[in-house]
Amino acid sequence: ELTTGPEIVEQFEGKQIDAFLAGVGTGGTLSGAGKVLKEKYPNIEIVAIEPEASPVLSGGEPGPHKLQGLGAGFVPDTLNTDIYDSIIQVGNDIAMETSRRVAKEEGILAGISSGAAIHAAIQKAKELGKGKTVLTVLPSNGERYLSTPLYSFDD
């Protein structure tokens, strides 16, 4: 509400944003930025990203997953559930595959939760179609994963 949302509005001055996606850990980014963006762009779709293996926001049961920082296993008090319009669930494997792909193809060293955000944003962009602007936040840096299986390449 105080930092990320206003910064996005400033950076996108004069442009339309059709969807904003953020992973839900504490819910702070989605709630705060989502509020600011809904005020500026009344038709924007705000999308929560949660682990497929722990779909608590969707009404499912909590479970173990690999999307560090997302899916605490409960709905945090800091999450304004009225802000988001939809939820995209992302699996462990596709989040990791996406992180690896953007590292190899785009030079973006992203962590697992960032891989989840990128995957969800691509899904939403395909759904909305050509000419729409989809924005997400990459919450994790891949540097902390360099010694893990995420960035252990065989090829």
From Swiss-Prot:
Report if keyword Amino-acid biosynthesis is assigned: yes
Q: Where does pyridoxal 5'-phosphate bind?
A: 25-29, 113
So which domain of life are we looking at? Bacteria
Q: In which pathway does it act?
A: Amino-acid biosynthesis; L-cysteine biosynthesis; L-cysteine from L-serine: step 2/2
Stretch forming the signal peptide: none
Q: Which SUPFAM superfamilies match?
A: Tryptophan synthase beta subunit-like PLP-dependent enzymes
Give EC number(s), comma-separated.
Answer: 2.5.1.47
Keywords noted in UniProt: Amino-acid biosynthesis, Cysteine biosynthesis, Pyridoxal phosphate, Transferase
Instruction: Enumerate the GO terms in the molecular function aspect.
Output: cysteine synthase activity
What chemistry does it catalyse, as a reaction equation? Answer: O-acetyl-L-serine + hydrogen sulfide = L-cysteine + acetate
Tell me the cofactors it needs. pyridoxal 5'-phosphate
Query: What Pfam families does the database record attribute to this sequence?
Result: PALP (PF00291)
Listed under subunit, the entry gives: Homodimer.
The record's comment on protein family reads: Belongs to the cysteine synthase/cystathionine beta-synthase family.
What name has this protein been given in UniProt? Cysteine synthase
The gene that this protein is the product of is cysK
